[in-house]
Amino acid sequence: MNLPLLLLITILIEIHALKDGYVIYKNSNCKYSCNINEKWKYCSPLCQKKHGKTGYCYFFACWCTDLPNDVPIYGETGSYCWSNK
Protein backbone atom coordinates (compact mmCIF):
# COMPACT_ATOMS: atom_id res chain seq x y z
CA MET A 1 0.00 0.00 0.00
CA ASN A 2 2.77 2.46 0.89
CA LEU A 3 4.93 1.50 -2.09
CA PRO A 4 2.49 2.78 -4.77
CA LEU A 5 2.03 6.02 -2.83
CA LEU A 6 5.79 6.49 -2.49
CA LEU A 7 6.24 5.81 -6.20
CA LEU A 8 3.56 8.37 -7.11
CA ILE A 9 5.13 11.03 -4.89
CA THR A 10 8.56 10.39 -6.41
CA ILE A 11 7.19 10.75 -9.94
CA LEU A 12 5.35 13.98 -9.09
CA ILE A 13 8.43 15.49 -7.48
CA GLU A 14 10.52 14.64 -10.53
CA ILE A 15 7.96 16.12 -12.93
CA HIS A 16 7.58 19.40 -11.03
CA ALA A 17 11.19 19.81 -9.88
CA LEU A 18 12.73 23.17 -10.65
CA LYS A 19 16.38 24.08 -10.88
CA ASP A 20 18.63 27.12 -10.62
CA GLY A 21 21.64 27.88 -12.78
CA TYR A 22 23.31 29.91 -15.49
CA VAL A 23 21.18 29.88 -18.64
CA ILE A 24 23.04 29.19 -21.88
CA TYR A 25 22.61 30.12 -25.52
CA LYS A 26 20.80 27.61 -27.71
CA ASN A 27 23.11 25.01 -29.31
CA SER A 28 26.05 26.00 -27.14
CA ASN A 29 27.32 25.84 -23.59
CA CYS A 30 27.94 29.60 -23.42
CA LYS A 31 26.41 31.68 -20.62
CA TYR A 32 24.53 34.92 -21.20
CA SER A 33 26.89 37.67 -20.04
CA CYS A 34 25.63 40.72 -18.16
CA ASN A 35 26.65 43.92 -16.39
CA ILE A 36 26.90 43.42 -12.63
CA ASN A 37 26.03 47.09 -12.07
CA GLU A 38 22.57 46.37 -13.50
CA LYS A 39 21.95 43.22 -11.48
CA TRP A 40 18.28 42.60 -12.42
CA LYS A 41 17.67 44.72 -15.53
CA TYR A 42 18.76 42.24 -18.23
CA CYS A 43 18.73 38.86 -16.49
CA SER A 44 15.33 38.88 -14.82
CA PRO A 45 13.36 39.33 -18.09
CA LEU A 46 15.64 36.79 -19.81
CA CYS A 47 15.00 34.19 -17.12
CA GLN A 48 11.26 34.83 -17.15
CA LYS A 49 11.29 34.38 -20.93
CA LYS A 50 12.81 30.95 -20.31
CA HIS A 51 9.98 30.22 -17.82
CA GLY A 52 12.05 30.81 -14.69
CA LYS A 53 10.83 32.77 -11.67
CA THR A 54 13.49 35.49 -11.81
CA GLY A 55 17.18 36.02 -12.42
CA TYR A 56 20.06 38.34 -11.71
CA CYS A 57 23.62 39.04 -12.78
CA TYR A 58 26.11 36.96 -10.78
CA PHE A 59 29.81 36.83 -11.65
CA PHE A 60 29.12 38.54 -15.01
CA ALA A 61 26.55 35.93 -16.16
CA CYS A 62 22.78 35.52 -15.80
CA TRP A 63 21.76 33.24 -12.93
CA CYS A 64 18.12 32.07 -13.07
CA THR A 65 15.96 30.59 -10.33
CA ASP A 66 13.15 28.03 -10.58
CA LEU A 67 13.80 26.99 -14.18
CA PRO A 68 11.93 24.01 -15.63
CA ASN A 69 13.97 20.84 -16.07
CA ASP A 70 13.88 21.09 -19.88
CA VAL A 71 15.80 24.41 -19.92
CA PRO A 72 19.52 23.71 -20.37
CA ILE A 73 21.90 25.31 -17.89
CA TYR A 74 25.66 25.70 -17.79
CA GLY A 75 27.50 22.62 -16.63
CA GLU A 76 25.02 20.00 -17.79
CA THR A 77 26.95 19.41 -21.03
CA GLY A 78 30.46 20.20 -19.83
CA SER A 79 32.29 23.21 -18.50
CA TYR A 80 33.55 24.83 -21.70
CA CYS A 81 31.81 27.30 -23.99
CA TRP A 82 31.30 25.83 -27.48
CA SER A 83 29.02 26.33 -30.45
CA ASN A 84 27.40 24.01 -33.03
CA LYS A 85 27.12 26.64 -35.77
UniProtKB/Swiss-Prot annotation:
Record-annotated disulphide pairs: C30-C81, C34-C57, C43-C62, C47-C64
Keyword entries, A-Z: Disulfide bond, Ion channel impairing toxin, Neurotoxin, Secreted, Signal, Toxin, Voltage-gated sodium channel impairing toxin
Protein name: Putative sodium channel toxin Ts34
GO terms classed as biological process: defense response
N-terminal signal peptide: 1-17
Location in or out of the cell: Secreted
Species annotation: Tityus serrulatus (Brazilian scorpion)
Domain remark in the UniProt entry: Has the structural arrangement of an alpha-helix connected to antiparallel beta-sheets by disulfide bonds (CS-alpha/beta).
